[in-house]
């Protein structure tokens, strides 16, 4: 099977490696190089680097125009595998592939169709996540399901944790999907009546309101890691939060909202919220290194009694 691979994100790197090991990847479509680092030098993404190292043809156009279509046609692919590419394909492009196109989507479709299923699952406090390989359709994430699996989301898991899990555990589902397509199996139609949707994450998501419940705040903190990272002011410093958990309790009801009330060596730095106690587990002062809560407290012994704003 001649596979054309489309991705711009490192979440797909392990899948590219394993697919290329077992199949004929005839080309890779990815995003153009982007400025990176202090010098803002152009840098290729991990997908492009891996494909180049394997001598696979790489296309990184700004626009998927007719010239790109002709180049892909000349590669004579059977199928396109898409995993976090980041652009919408026109029908003219999808029609290139005689066996069709499949997409890896990190949710239990039809739940969380759209661009941020992992972040949205954590933001909503879901305890179960999933990976779906679907046939691509013109309507976003609405194609027939070829393979699917689910996994546990723990209370303290971040989006970064789930990205890593999905990256390492998608390949077998891709193999299952490819095998089904090779045998003429078209998959199972989604029940669109059960569909839910998610939108792009942006910098507004990083703003915290300590009047919310501890459950809601920890969800936002964990959803915003690795980007855009939730934060709040403490005195004149910006504190960036990387991981949190929570306690359902009515204790400390007389304390001010946003107040750091206790350091618990076995649980975290405790903060009063509108409902319950937030446990800060990993955090940093802006411009400093990320620390676990014990290291952060050891370097900031005057925390107790201060109030986040």
From Swiss-Prot:
What are its E.C. numbers? 2.1.2.9
Q: Which Pfam families match?
A: Formyl_trans_C, Formyl_trans_N
Catalytic activity reads:
L-methionyl-tRNA(fMet) + (6R)-10-formyltetrahydrofolate = N-formyl-L-methionyl-tRNA(fMet) + (6S)-5,6,7,8-tetrahydrofolate + H(+)
Spell out the InterPro entries in the cross-references.
Answer: Fmt, Formyl_trans_C, Formyl_trans_C_sf, Formyl_transf_N, Formyl_transf_N_sf, Formyl_transferase-like_C_sf, Met-tRNA-FMT_C, Met-tRNA-FMT_N
Q: Where does (6S)-5,6,7,8-tetrahydrofolate bind?
A: 107-110
Entry's NCBIfam families?
fmt
- The name under which this protein is listed is Methionyl-tRNA formyltransferase
Native species: Borrelia hermsii (strain HS1 / DAH)
